[in-house]
Amino acid sequence: MKRILILIAAVAYLSGCGKIIDWVPVTFQIRVQDALGNDLLDPANDNRWLAGTTIRFRGIVVDLDETGITSPITRDMSVTYEGFRLEKGEDYYFLAFGQFEGATDYDEESFVIYWPDKTYNVITYDRRINTRKGGAKEVWKLDGVKCTSPIIIVR
């Protein structure tokens, strides 16, 4: 009887499931404003200067899509590449790029935004996954200086 109990306990212990984490896909958000804090991406503020903006990631150059997302918002957590686009948030407009796998470490990944006036900004992203704690440590840099997300570019 004792052997059977030990066997049942061993089977229950060894067949237990580990911690399952649904990692949220990463989307890069970039706000653009002037020195006074005015949203330069808002169509009401004449954002025609955006035409011709591109982003380069891993050698691939993607043009800005100013029409926004047309796909429905769902609760699905799968990664869907949605390109480089202009989106409207709660209180402001922003440029979004992605989505990228949330369960992946990123080591100093660089994104270069090329503006129509021939200037550019370099965004660097570093991410370390900690499966034990169920979180990730993210470091964002704008032109080499640490910043927060969403990234705010002053033009």
What is the predicted role of each segment?
Residues 32-46:
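Short amphipathic, basic-aromatic surface patches that mediate peripheral association
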Residues 24, 43-52:
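Short coil-to-beta strand junction motifs in C2/discoidin
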